[in-house]
Every structure is written in structure tokens, then in C-alpha cells.
Curated annotation (Swiss-Prot):
The gene is ilvD. Functions in the biosynthesis of branched-chain amino acids. Catalyzes the dehydration of (2R,3R)-2,3-dihydroxy-3-methylpentanoate (2,3-dihydroxy-3-methylvalerate) into 2-oxo-3-methylpentanoate (2-oxo-3-methylvalerate) and of (2R)-2,3-dihydroxy-3-methylbutanoate (2,3-dihydroxyisovalerate) into 2-oxo-3-methylbutanoate (2-oxoisovalerate), the penultimate precursor to L-isoleucine and L-valine, respectively. Homodimer. Belongs to the IlvD/Edd family. Signal peptide: none annotated. Gene3D superfamilies: IlvD/EDD C-terminal domain-like. This is Dihydroxy-acid dehydratase. SUPFAM superfamilies: IlvD/EDD N-terminal domain-like, LeuD/IlvD-like. It comes from the Bacteria. The active site is at 473 (proton acceptor). It catalyses: (2R)-2,3-dihydroxy-3-methylbutanoate = 3-methyl-2-oxobutanoate + H2O; (2R,3R)-2,3-dihydroxy-3-methylpentanoate = (S)-3-methyl-2-oxopentanoate + H2O. PANTHER family: D-XYLONATE DEHYDRATASE (PTHR43661), D-XYLONATE DEHYDRATASE YAGF-RELATED (PTHR43661:SF3).
């Protein structure tokens, strides 16, 4: 066992003495058992994590019963909703790398034999996955589960996005203070990751398709007793994974990655999933190109429409309709779309995991014969405005905006854009451009939920597009094109735009362009002053110097590799 490094032999007497002092060693016999890290992300600041302390307790109890010795440790976490619209959002994506590094540090420093990872919200799940693939020891994921959707006293179904959009409605005089307060009080009724197909739930659903989590992980509610049972089962499974030495890189093959993207496209997941999955692929040393996604999307039907694409369906409804397994089982009817032979943490293949799954409500999960659209709910756009690509959640775009040409309305930061939208500076037909908000320029590639919600709340969602080198919340809806690469801070073409330039978005053709010649773009870029970093000290300053483009997953540069060739 790896842990023998810190517990076996006379020379390790000091190590054993310290381990006994933790209280986790019940008897000397424990030194013969595998040491299992319970990697928790309990945090009283995040509603999706406020209940995880109890899940950690359950995990430790079950690991010990199954023959292991549990050691719980915590990671940091950021609530994207609370961090939205201020300096905090610049730390959100950057926190993913801190989480990955911290999990790596604890697991390697203490020679743990395996990990039970308990994440839930946006950056915590991918951060832990990146670490798992980097250190490559047996790991199983079991998330905290989604939040229930809310209901106002009048019976309206609401979620967090309803509150953001209500702010826009209130500022436009469309609703009063009483209605705003009613939505605020009702939207988030308890613990769990926000209730739609936002980034947290998207990643937790993808965990099943990747093979890292048990069936049900993505959809069983946080408050459902089955969630505790899932934790128990996962905590028992880790001991078997350690005994059989089944590691993350045994599970995450290129085809497992494609399975996850197929699920993502079928559910219209958050655009952030592309960013995170590319980063995960990098840690697994899988050769995967951003441009390959359109071909997969073209053969993946969009069969499960969930909030924010529709307020009629939330994750609890997907669970009731059969969950991720039912969606994957339905997709498996398409010849060659899924690789059902990929290994999972159950010890079985993906095909075996989903063999008995069935759709229980066709109004929630549609048949592949009657999809919402024949192609997936996410797409990658290319053109002279995004030579390295941009991402759009097609499933949340109004039909009227699938093709749009309009004049650019330029803002060099999100705050200015929000003021412009709220101040009636943006008119029907415009293309709002928010730039210098990429991984380097932001820094941290902040989400644009506040401006997109303001556009929707002010009734402009079917006439205004928004493009950015930043990113979007999984809750954003409308013609929102993000991750434009190269970013403005790297002198990408988006930095050459002037107010009034005509921008054409053609989602069916997967293109985004500006009506400028290459010569004009290059002349404008050459005339720009060097980019001046916005933050010059602390973690974000270091992050901005090391982060790469969105089309590579916004991973950090590794200037020196000590890995053997």
C-alpha cells in the first residue's frame, strides 16, 4: 500500500506516533489497513455545501466498516452566485486550480491509498477531478446533490436565475418590490446545488458518464434520504477500488470523455462544462481538440431540456424521470454514439450500469425519435472574431436569435456593461461586447450572469446578443456567446472591435464574424497599447501570468516539467 511509506517499519515510529495523536487510529491493527482520505468541501458560505459535514461523517463511518481508516480533510470553495457581480467572481475559476493543487498536496504529503471526494458546486467538482487524475490513486466521487426548485406563494416555480432576472424586471419597472421579495424568499428553499442544469449539476451529472460516480449522483436531491445511502455505497466501493487498484486513468479514457460530452449535449449543459472537461482531459494527458466537439454535437440529439432553458423542468424532475442513466440508455440506441464498454467506479462497464434504466416521463426526457432538436444543446463557433473558437448554449437561445447581425456595443468590463444595460444604452438589435474579461484579462474569466439576466429581465432576450471573452453562468440564457479565443488581453480580434462594427452570429453554421477585413483587424490590433494587468499582487496576479486560453480549458502553464519522458 502507498500508505506503508508513512506507517511501516521501525523508522516510521515518529509517523505512527503522530497518526495516533489524530484520534483516527483506533488500534495498531489500523496500520495494516488502507488509509482513505475523505476529501470534503463543507462550507457554511455555500448552500450547496452547507450540509456536507454530515455526508463526511457518514463516509468515515462506512469506510471504517468496510475495512479502511478514514481521514477527513477539507478544500476551499466559492459560491458563484454570491461571488457574482463583484471582485469575488474573479476568484471563482481561479479557485479550481487551488482546489486541484490542495487535494494533490494533502494526498501526496500523507501517502493516502484512496480518496472519497465530496464536492458539489461549480469549481469544486472539476478541481477535485483534476487532482484525482494528476495523482492517479483510486478515487470515487459522491456529490452533495441538487437543491429543490422553489415555489412562490402564488404557485410560480422559481430558482436562483428567477431572482437574477427579477432584478432586471424590477429595474425596468415591470415588477414591484413585493414581487421581487417574494421571488427572493422562495427561489432557494434549502441546501443543495442550484436546481437547474447549471454548472454544478452539469458536472455532477457528467461524473456518472465519465465513470467517476455511482448512478444517481447527478440527480438525487440533497435532502433525499437516498443521497445518504449513495454516500454509504460510495464509501464502501472505495475499499474495493483500492484493493483492485482501479485508478482514475484506468477509467477516464478518450471514449469516456466523449460519452460525457454526448450526455452534456443531450441535456444542454452549462458551457462551463466544456472548459472544465478540457482541463480534466489535460490532466489525464488525453489528446483532445476543442474543434472536435461540433462533430459529436451534430449526431447527439437534445432530449432533456432543463432550467434555464425551461422553467418547467428542474433536476428533481430529471431524477423522477429516470435520471442520467435513462438519458444515457436512450442515447445508446444511436449506433456508435456511446462506448458502453468504458469502466466505471462500480466495477462494471457503463453499459452494465445503464442496462435496466428506462425513461419514466417522456415529457421530461424525450425519445431520440422526438428530440427538442436533432443536434446537441451546446456548440462551438469559429470565425474571424474567434479564430480559436467560442461556445454557445444553443438549447437556451431563442429561435429568433439563432441567426443575428447587429452593431457592436462595446464595454471593456462587465460593470460598465451592466450600467449600460440598466441605463437603456443597449437597444434591440445590438450585439453587446464585453471584453478584457478572459482568463488573463479578467483576470479569472468572470461569469456574466448579471448582464445576461438584465437583458432577459428587460425584455431584450429575443433581440440582443451578448458576446464575451469571459464566460457565462450555467444559468445564463439567451444568445450568449462566451469563451471567445484568443481573448482581448492576448490581442485576439475581439480587442479590435469598435462601436458600430457589424457582427454576424450564425449558430446553425457554427460561425461568428465581424464585417472587417483581416488587414483592418490587424491594423487596429497593432495600434493598441500593451495590456495592463488589472490586479498586480496576490493570487490573481500570479494566476493571470500563468493561465492559458479558454479553448484549452484555462489551465495553468507548466513551464518546467519534472515528469520522466
Amino acid at each position: 500500500m502507498r500508505s506503508d511509506t508513512i506507517k511501516t517499519g521501525f523508522e516510521k515510529a515518529p509517523h505512527r506516533s503522530l497518526l495516533k495523536a489524530t484520534g483516527s487510529i483506533v488500534s495498531n491493527n489500523d496500520f495494516k489497513k488502507p488509509f482513505i482520505g475523505i476529501c470534503n468541501s463543507y462550507n457554511e458560505l455555500i448552500p450547496g455545501h452547507s450540509h456536507l459535514q454530515e455526508l463526511g461523517r457518514i463516509a468515515k463511518e462506512e469506510v471504517r466498516k468496510a475495512g479502511g481508516v478514514p481521514f477527513e480533510f477539507n478544500t476551499i470553495g466559492v459560491c458563484d452566485g454570491i461571488a457574482m457581480g463583484h471582485i469575488g467572481m474573479r476568484y471563482s475559476l481561479a479557485s479550481r486550480e487551488l482546489i486541484a493543487d490542495s487535494v494533490e498536496t494533502v494526498a501526496q504529503a500523507h501517502c493516502l491509498d484512496g480518496l472519497v471526494c465530496i464536492p458539489n458546486c461549480d469549481k469544486i467538482t472539476p478541481g477535485m477531478m483534476m487532482a484525482a487524475l494528476r495523482i492517479n490513486i483510486p478515487v470515487i466521487f459522491v456529490s452533495g446533490g441538487p437543491m429543490k426548485a422553489g415555489h412562490t406563494p402564488s404557485g410560480q416555480t422559481v430558482d436562483l436565475i428567477s431572482v437574477f432576472e427579477a432584478v432586471g424586471q424590477f429595474s425596468a419597472g415591470k415588477i414591484g418590490n413585493e414581487e421581487l421579495e417574494s421571488i427572493e424568499e422562495s427561489a432557494c428553499p434549502g441546501c443543495g446545488s442550484c436546481s437547474g442544469m447549471f454548472t454544478a449539476n452539469s458536472m455532477n451529472c457528467l461524473s456518472e458518464a465519465l465513470g467517476f460516480a455511482l448512478p444517481g449522483n447527478g440527480t438525487i436531491l440533497a435532502i433525499d434520504p437516498r443521497r445518504n445511502e449513495l454516500v454509504r455505497e460510495a464509501s464502501r466501493r472505495i475499499i474495493d477500488l483500492v484493493k483492485k487498484d482501479i485508478k482514475p486513468r484506468d477509467i477516464l479514457s478518450r471514449n469516456a470523455l466523449l460519452n460525457a460530452f454526448a450526455l452534456d449535449f443531450a441535456m444542454g449543459g452549462s458551457t462551463n462544462t466544456i472548459l472544465h472537461t478540457l482541463a480534466i482531459a489535460n490532466e489525464a494527458e488525453l489528446d483532445f481538440n476543442f474543434s472536435e466537439l461540433n462533430a459529436l454535437s451534430a449526431k447527439t440529439p437534445y432530449i432533456c431540456k432543463v432550467s434555464p432553458a425551461t422553467m418547467a423542468v428542474h433536476i428533481e424532475d430529471v431524477d423522477r424521470a429516470g435520471g442520467v442513466s435513462a438519458i444515457l440508455h436512450e442515447l445508446s440506441r444511436i449506433d456508435g454514439l456511446l462506448d458502453l464498454s468504458t469502466l466505471t467506479v462500480t466495477g462494471k462497464t457503463l453499459g452494465e450500469n445503464i442496462a435496466d434504466a428506462e425513461i419514466l416521463d417522456y415529457t421530461v426526457i424525450r425519445s431520440i425519435d422526438e428530440p427538442y432538436s436533432a443536434t446537441g444543446g451546446l456548440a462551438v463557433l469559429f470565425g474571424n472574431l474567434a479564430p480559436q473558437g467560442a461556445v454557445v448554449k444553443t438549447g437556451a437561445v431563442a429561435p429568433e436569435m439563432m441567426k443575428h447581425t447587429g452593431p457592436a456595443k462595446i464595454y471593456d468590463c462587465q460593470d460598465d456593461a451592466i450600467k449600460g444595460i440598466m441605463g437603456d444604452d443597449v437597444k434591440a438589435g445590438d450585439v453587446v461586447v464585453i471584453r478584457y474579461e478572459g482568463p488573463k484579462g479578467g483576470p479569472g474569466m468572470p461569469e456574466m450572469l448579471s448582464p445576461t439576466s438584465a437583458i432577459m429581465g428587460r425584455g431584450l432576450g429575443e433581440s440582443v446578443a451578448l458576446i464575451t471573452d469571459g464566460r457565462f453562468s450555467g444559468g445564463s440564457r439567451g444568445a450568449c456567446i462566451g469563451h471567445i479565443s484568443p481573448e482581448a488581453a492576448e490581442r485576439g480580434p475581439i480587442a479590435a472591435l469598435h462601436n458600430g462594427d457589424l457582427i454576424t452570429i450564425d449558430i446553425p453554421s457554427r460561425s461568428i464574424s465581424v464585417n472587417l477585413t483581416e488587414e483592418t483587424i490587424n491594423e487596429r490590433l497593432a495600434a493598441l497599447k500593451p495590456f495592463e494587468p488589472k490586479i498586480k499582487k496576490g493570487y490573481l496576479a500570479r494566476y493571470a501570468q500563468m493561465v492559458t486560453s479558454a479553448n484549452t480549458g484555462a489551465i495553468l502553464k507548466n513551464p518546467v516539467s519534472c515528469e520522466p519522458k
